[in-house]
C-alpha cells in the first residue's frame, strides 16, 4: 500500500461554480430572467422533496424552448439524493445525455452525477462515471469514498484516501470522517494514526466532527487511551463527541466508564441525543445495571425523545437483558413502528425468562402483522426449545426451516444441533451435522459442545482430530470444549495435558479457558489446584470475572480455607466495582459459612438484606449448617413479606435446617405448608430430607409410607437412611429387603456395601458381613478413607491427611498434637 504523503497542505481554493460551462452565450441564456425564475422555483421544489413537480417545470422549459442551465440539473439531482430517488435521477441522467456533450461532459454535471449515484449506493455506475471524470475534485472523491465506506468496501475507501493525497487533492472535513470510519471497521489502528497525523498537519483537528471521528476510530480499534486523549483535546465538545467516546467504551466492555462519561456529559450541560441514551442503555444491559438503565429511560422521557425504532429497540434490549419483561412489554406496546428486529427482541426476552408459551404467542401475532420470520426469529425459537428441553417444539421449528429453505443457513443448523443436544438426542445432532454440506468452525464447535456437555470425551477427541484432518484449525473455543469434555468425564490429568498442548500450539488461553480448568478442578475434588490456576491466570495478565471469583470461592469452601477466602474477598472489594453481584455475594456467604465464620457470613448478607432470593437461600443454608434452626425459620418466614417467593432450593435449605436440628414437627409443618398453601410440588430432594428426618427420629414405618406414596422412585440416599434407622432400632426383618433395593439402586457405590455390612454386623449376621466384603472385592470396590484438610497460619497451601495415613511429611508433629489433645480431653472429663 502506498505511503501517506503528509508533508502537504489542504486545498486553498474551494470548489465553485467556476467549473460550470464557460460559454458566454450559454451563461447569458441560463441567467435570463425566465431561466432564473425557473431555477429558483425548481430549487424550492427540490428542497421540499417535490421532485416530480420540479421535473414538470423542466419539461415546461423544454416546451418553451428555454435553455436549461447545468445548475438546474444539479438541483434536481441533489433533490433525488435527499429523497434517495434513484429512478428519477436516472431519468435526469438520460435527459442530460440526450442534450449532448455540452451538458454530458460538463465538469459540474459530471461531479453531480457521481455524487448522486454514490449517495444512492449505486457504486458500479458511480465508479464508471468517476473513472471518466476529466477533473476529479474533493467532492467527487468524498462521494466515492463515502459510498465504499457505507457498503463495507473499507479497504477501497482507504486506497481512495491514499490516491487523493498522491494526486495532491487534500481530503477535507467531509472525507476524513469516512476514512476514520473505514479504519475503525478494519481495526487498522496504525493506518488510523497516519490519518490522525494528516488531520493535525492540515489543521482539521479543531473540527469537532473530525475529532469525534478520530475518537470513534480509536475506540473501534480498542485503543481507548488515544480515544480519550483526542476527546480531551476537543475544545467545544458536542453530543457527537461525547457519544463517540461512550460508544468506544461500551464496545470494549468498559460499561462503567461509559456510564460515568454520561454523568459527566450531563454535568457539562450537553443535551443527550437518542444515540447517547441508546449507548447508556447498552452499557446498563451489559453490566446488569438496572437503576442506571431506568435513569437513562427517564432522561429520554424528560428530554421529550420520541419512542422511535432506535430508542425503542434499545429500551427493549435493556429491559429484556435485565429480566424486567413487564417493562419490555410496556415499551413494545407503545412503539408505533415495529420491524422484525423489534419483534425478535421481545420474543427473545420471553425465552430468556423461560416464558416459552408467551414467546410462541408473540410469534403468532408477528405473522398476523404480515411480518416473516427471519433466521434470528427461528434461532430464538430453537433456543426456547433447547432451554425447556421441548423436543416437539424444536422439531416443529426445524420443519418450518426446511419448508422455507432455511436449512442451508449454518447459524440455524448450529442452533438445531444445540437443541437436539440439550434435549438429550446427540444422535440427531450428529445427523444434522452430517447433512450440512458446508461446515464452518462454528458448526464443528457446536457438535463438540454437545459431546463436551455430556462428558463424551472419546467422541469429542475423535471430532477434535477429525476437524483438523478436514483442514479446519481449532480456535480457543474448540480447545476450551475439548478440555471441558475431559473434565466432565473426570479425566483431570488429561485435561491439564490438553491445556498445556493448547498453549504450545500457539493458542493463548482466555478467561473461559482458565475458569473451565478451575471449575473442573473443583468439581473433581481438586480444589487446591483450582486456587493455583487462579493465581496462574492472574500472572498471565487476565483479571478474574464474576464467574471466576465464584468458582474460586467455591474451592475455598470445599477446602474450608478461610485465609484464602478472605484474600479473595479483599480482591473483590478492591477490583470489582460491581461486587454487589448476587452470584458473588451468595458465594461469599457460602464460603464464610463453610469456613467456620458464620458472623462474617451474616455481615455480607446483612448489607443486602433480602435483596435477592439466591442470597437468602445461601444464608438459610448457612444457618442449617450451624444448626441455627430459629434463625433459618425466621428468615424463611420473612421472605414473602419482602416480595420474594421461596423456590425449591429455599425449601431444601430450610428442611436441612430442621434435619440438622432434629426438629421433626417443624419439618412436617413446612412440608405440609408448601403442598397446601404454596401450591408447590415437593421434589425428590424434599422427600429425601423428610425420609432422612423420620428415619433418624426412629419413625421407620412413617418413612416407608412416605416413600411408597411419593411420585418418585426412591434414590440410594433414602434407602441408606432407612437401613441406618433399622440398624439403630434392630429391625432386622427390613434389612434384607432394603439391602437388595440399595444395591439395585447403586451397585458401584462402596459406601452402600459398608452401610449394609454394618447393619448385618449389628445383627450378628457375620456370614452376610463376609458376603458383602467378598462382593466388594469381586467388583474391585474399596472403602474410601476419611479425609481432612487443615491450613496452618503463615503457610501456603492446604495439608490433606486421611485415616491411618502415615505418609505425611509432618506425621510426627500430627501424632504428638493428637496425643496432647487426647490427654487434654481426658483430663477435662475427670
UniProtKB/Swiss-Prot annotation:
Q: Does the keyword Ribonucleoprotein apply?
A: no
Query: Mind listing the UniProt keywords for this protein, alphabetically?
Result: Chloroplast, Plastid, Repeat, Transit peptide
Q: Which Gene3D superfamilies match?
A: Tetratricopeptide repeat domain
Its main localization is: plastid
**Where does the UniProt annotation locate this protein?**
Plastid, Chloroplast
* Spans through the membrane: none
* Disordered: annotated span: 15-36
Annotated Gene Ontology cellular component terms: chloroplast
- Region Type E motif, as annotated, extends over 718-793
- The UniProt entry annotates PPR repeats at 69-103, 106-136, 137-171, 172-206, 207-237, 238-272, 273-307, 308-338, 339-373, 374-408, 409-439, 440-474, 475-509, 510-544, 545-575, 581-611, 612-646, 647-682, 683-713
The residues forming the transit peptide are: 1-59
Q: Would the keyword Plastid turn up in this protein's UniProt record?
A: yes
* SUPFAM superfamilies per the UniProt record, alphabetical: TPR-like (SSF48452)
Residue segments, region Type E(+) motif = 796-826
State one molecular function term (GO): mRNA binding
What does the sequence similarity comment in the record state about its family?
Belongs to the PPR family. PCMP-E subfamily.
Biological role? Plays a major role in chloroplast RNA editing. Acts as a site-recognition transacting factor involved in the edition of the site 2 of ndhD (ndhD-2), which encodes a subunit of the NDH complex.
Please state what the protein is called. Answer: Pentatricopeptide repeat-containing protein At5g55740, chloroplastic
Amino acid at each position: 500500500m502506498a505511503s501517506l504523503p503528509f508533508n502537504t497542505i489542504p486545498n486553498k481554493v474551494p470548489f465553485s461554480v467556476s467549473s460550470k460551462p464557460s460559454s458566454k452565450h450559454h451563461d447569458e441564456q441560463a441567467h435570463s430572467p425566465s431561466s432564473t425564475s425557473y431555477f429558483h422555483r425548481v430549487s424550492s421544489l427540490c428542497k421540499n422533496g417535490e421532485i416530480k413537480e420540479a421535473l414538470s417545470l423542466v419539461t415546461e422549459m423544454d416546451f418553451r424552448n428555454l435553455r436549461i442551465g447545468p445548475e438546474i440539473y444539479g438541483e434536481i439531482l441533489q433533490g433525488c439524493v435527499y429523497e434517495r430517488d434513484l429512478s428519477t435521477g436516472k431519468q435526469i441522467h438520460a435527459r442530460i445525455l440526450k442534450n449532448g456533450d455540452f451538458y454530458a461532459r460538463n465538469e459540474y454535471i459530471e461531479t453531480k452525477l457521481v455524487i448522486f449515484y454514490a449517495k444512492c449506493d449505486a457504486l458500479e455506475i458511480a465508479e464508471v462515471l468517476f473513472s471518466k471524470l476529466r477533473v476529479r475534485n474533493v467532492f467527487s472523491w468524498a462521494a466515492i469514498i463515502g459510498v465504499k465506506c457505507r457498503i463495507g468496501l473499507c479497504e477501497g475507501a482507504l486506497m481512495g484516501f491514499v490516491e487523493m493525497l498522491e494526486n495532491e487533492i487534500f481530503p477535507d472535513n467531509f472525507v476524513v470522517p469516512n476514512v476514520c470510519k473505514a479504519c475503525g471497521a478494519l481495526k487498522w489502528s496504525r493506518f488510523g494514526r497516519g490519518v490522525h497525523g494528516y488531520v493535525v498537519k492540515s489543521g482539521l483537528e479543531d473540527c469537532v466532527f473530525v475529532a469525534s471521528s478520530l475518537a470513534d476510530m480509536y475506540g473501534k480499534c480498542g485503543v481507548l487511551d488515544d480515544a480519550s486523549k483526542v476527546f480531551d483535546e476537543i475544545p467545544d465538545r458536542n453530543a457527537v463527541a461525547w457519544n463517540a467516546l461512550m460508544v468506544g467504551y461500551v464496545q470494549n466492555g468498559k460499561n462503567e466508564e461509559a456510564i460515568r462519561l454520561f454523568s459527566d456529559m450531563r454535568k457539562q450541560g450537553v443535551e443527550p441525543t437518542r444515540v447517547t441514551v441508546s449507548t447508556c442503555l447498552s452499557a446498563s444491559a451489559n453490566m446488569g445495571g438496572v437503576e442506571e438503565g431506568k435513569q437513562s429511560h427517564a432522561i429520554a422521557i424528560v428530554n421529550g425523545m420520541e419512542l422511535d425504532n432506535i430508542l425503542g429497540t434499545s429500551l427493549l434490549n435493556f429491559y429484556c437483558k435485565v429480566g424486567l419483561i413487564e417493562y419490555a412489554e410496556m415499551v413494545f406496546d407503545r412503539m408505533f413502528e415495529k420491524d422484525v428486529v423489534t419483534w425478535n427482541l421481545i420474543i427473545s426476552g420471553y425465552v430468556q425468562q423461560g416464558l416459552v408459551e408467551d414467546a410462541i404467542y408473540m410469534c403468532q401475532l408477528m405473522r398476523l402483522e404480515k411480518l416473516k420470520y427471519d433466521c434470528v426469529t427461528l434461532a430464538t425459537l430453537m433456543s426456547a426449545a433447547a432451554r425447556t428441553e421441548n423436543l416437539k417444539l424444536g422439531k416443529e421449528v426445524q420443519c418450518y426451516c426446511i419448508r422455507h429453505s432455511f436449512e442451508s443457513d449454518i447459524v440455524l443448523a448450529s442452533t438445531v444441533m444445540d437443541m437436539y443436544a440439550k434435549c438429550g438426542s446427540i444422535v440427531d445432532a450428529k445427523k444434522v451435522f452430517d447433512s450440512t454440506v458446508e461446515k464452518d468452525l462454528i458448526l464443528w464447535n457446536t457438535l463438540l459442545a454437545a459431546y463436551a456437555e455430556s462428558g463424551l470425551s472419546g467422541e469429542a477427541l475423535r471430532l477434535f482430530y477429525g476437524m483438523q484432518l478436514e483442514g479446519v484449525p481449532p480456535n480457543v473455543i474448540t480447545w476450551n470444549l475439548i478440555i471441558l469434555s475431559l473434565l466432565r468425564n473426570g479425566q483431570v490429568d488429561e485435561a491439564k495435558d490438553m491445556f498445556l498442548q493448547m498453549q504450545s500450539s500457539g493458542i493463548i488461553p482466555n478467561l473461559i479457558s482458565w475458569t473451565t480448568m478451575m471449575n473442573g478442578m473443583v468439581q473433581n475434588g481438586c480444589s487446591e489446584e483450582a486456587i493455583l490456576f487462579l493465581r496462574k491466570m492472574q500472572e498471565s495478565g487476565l483479571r478474574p470475572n464474576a464467574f471466576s471469583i465464584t468458582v474460586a470461592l467455591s474451592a475455598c469452601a470445599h477446602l474450608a480455607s478461610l485465609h484464602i477466602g478472605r484474600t479473595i474477598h479483599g480482591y473483590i472489594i478492591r477490583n470489582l466495582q460491581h461486587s454487589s453481584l448476587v452470584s458473588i455475594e451468595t458465594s461469599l456467604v457460602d464460603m464464610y459459612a463453610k469456613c467456620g465464620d458464620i458472623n462474617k457470613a451474616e455481615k455480607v448478607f446483612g448489607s443486602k438484606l433480602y435483596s435477592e432470593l439466591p442470597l437468602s437461600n445461601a444464608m438459610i443454608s448457612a444457618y442449617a449448617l450451624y444448626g441455627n434452626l430459629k434463625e433459618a425459620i425466621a428468615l424463611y418466614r420473612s421472605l414473602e413479606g419482602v416480595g420474594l417467593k421461596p423456590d425449591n432450593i429455599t425449601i431444601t435449605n430450610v428442611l436441612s435446617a430442621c434435619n440438622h436440628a432434629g426438629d421433626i414437627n417443624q419439618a412436617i409443618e413446612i412440608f405440609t405448608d408448601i403442598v397446601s398453601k404454596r401450591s408447590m410440588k415437593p421434589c425428590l430432594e424434599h422427600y429425601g430430607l423428610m425420609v432422612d428426618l423420620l428415619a433418624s427420629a426412629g419413625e421407620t414405618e412413617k418413612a416407608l409410607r412416605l416413600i411408597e406414596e411419593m411420585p418418585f422412585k426412591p434414590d440410594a440416599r433414602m434407602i441408606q437412611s432407612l437401613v441406618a434407622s433399622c440398624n439403630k432400632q434392630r429391625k432386622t426383618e427390613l434389612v434384607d429387603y432394603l439391602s437388595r433395593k440399595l444395591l439395585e439402586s447403586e451397585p458401584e457405590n462402596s459406601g452402600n456395601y459398608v452401610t449394609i455390612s454394618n447393619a448385618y454386623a449389628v445383627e450378628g449376621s457375620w456370614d452376610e458381613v463376609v458376603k458383602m466384603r467378598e462382593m466388594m472385592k469381586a467388583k474391585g470396590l474399596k472403602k474410601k478413607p476419611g479425609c481432612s484438610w487443615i491450613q496452618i497460619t503463615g503457610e501456603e497451601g492446604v495439608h490433606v491427611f486421611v485415616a491411618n495415613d502415615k505418609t505425611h511429611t509432618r506425621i510426627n508433629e500430627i501424632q504428638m498434637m493428637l496425643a496432647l489433645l487426647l490427654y487434654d480431653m481426658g483430663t477435662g472429663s475427670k
